Amino acid sequence: MASKRITQETFDAAVRENIEEFEMGTEEAIREAVEQFESQGVDLSNIVKTIPKVSLDGLQEPTHSVLQALNDLQESLTGSRLQEVSAHLVRFCDQCKQQKASRYLAAQKGAYPILLAAWQLAATSNQGLLLQALNALAVLTDGQPDLLDAQGLHLLVATLAQNAANTELTCCGIRCVRHVCLKHEQNRQDLVKAGVLPLLTAAITQHGQHADVVREACWALRVMTFDDDIRVPFGHAHEHAKMIVQENKGLKVLIEAARAFSDNPGVLSELCSTLSRLAVRNEFCQEVIDLGGLGILVTLLADCNDHQDLVKQVLSALRAIAGNDDVKDAIVRAGGTESIVAAMTRHLASPQVCEQSCAALCVLALRKPDNSRVIIEGGGALAALQAMKAHPQEAGVQKQACMLIRNLVSRSQVFSKPILDLGAEELILQARAAHPDCEDVAKAALRDLGCRVELRELWTGKKGDLAL
């Protein structure tokens, strides 16, 4: 059942009542109001839990700091006082950054059209002011993508196109794109139609020495491939990934950027994460190889083993491109299996690295007996079982390890005994008992290992009907 909601005014009135009628102190009054509403099942996540303040001139009704900043901004815009507009934009932005509730309250009180007016005023006269307006809009739309309208969308694309050489404006504009597209499929589709994809890939190329721009552009490109909006039956994630690769040379752009940032683990993590989102077709996986991407990934896995997040993203990218059977063999020939096993062993305490390592090895072993032999001889099965022991409560690790073991032996029964001798059966049975999600994969692994498996009929016929 959906949580109950109240307005900011209702909460403020309750706090004021506690102070005036029950003579409570400020903190006690707020705490009492919070407890009162939460006991009634009210969601207060979008409520500012402070006392409204009196304005500096004392002429206005007490209001929250973010709304005071918004009112002052609107007044300065009415008089086109650019210096004051600049100061109030900074102040408003600082208030919105403090908490989600402040952004929500500002949006409820008409902040978006006011920022749009500041944006339009700055676009024709002042790049410094334009940057401040864009920054404020990026903060306001964080978690509130519904605010974007058609006017703002076209203004955003035009701003990116007209200021492509400006590093700060490009970075801030792309951050706006990311915020308004996250969990909003219609905004994604509309921005793609308006031509945002070539602007994103061009930003990586044009600002290839600026880590912040590359990081933001990668993040925005990934968001374009998300299917995270529960309000639509299906999205265009696959189509957007195809457009990024085929029409905008996305893979080439990312791989060239990886070469340029070879000593920056943070940027490399973003690039690898984006690469894995774009490897959605067989030919795209092969293109990564043709562009020299495999060598970069394997080298990163070997040379950057100390950077856990980068290791995780490289493993994810290897897993993605290994969907192509020819690429599987290329990864094995390049020494990828040894590097994956080494990464899992090095980061055995990390469930995320263990899960991604098992998943990557699982894909490499699928339908490939020769690859299975290389993995087992390189200690892959042992490492996977060690990961299962280290993370018994992590369903993802248990599931991927079971799938890996199944793939290792499904076409190479000769490997069953060595894996069983390592204690695989007991670990798989434990995973099956502890995690319902592992039921099918655990059963498949036990079956292909030659262990006794109790099979249960899911459906039985009864006088022409199916019954569970």
Curated annotation (Swiss-Prot):
Positions of modified residues (Phosphoserine): 39
Domain of life, per lineage: Eukaryota
Keyword match Metal-binding: no
Record flagged with keyword Phosphoprotein: yes
ARM repeat intervals: 195-239, 249-293, 294-336, 337-379
Keywords carried by this UniProt record: Methylation, Phosphoprotein, Repeat
SMART domains, alphabetized: ARM
GO BP annotations listed: hematopoietic progenitor cell differentiation
Modification after translation: Methylated at His-238 by METTL9.
InterPro entries hit by this protein: ARM-like, ARM-type_fold, Armadillo
A Gene Ontology term for the protein's cellular component: cytosol
Residue numbers bearing the Pros-methylhistidine modification: 238
PANTHER family: ARMADILLO REPEAT-CONTAINING PROTEIN 6
UniProt record similarity statement: Belongs to the ARMC6 family.
Name the UniProt record assigns to this protein: Armadillo repeat-containing protein 6
Record organism: Mus musculus
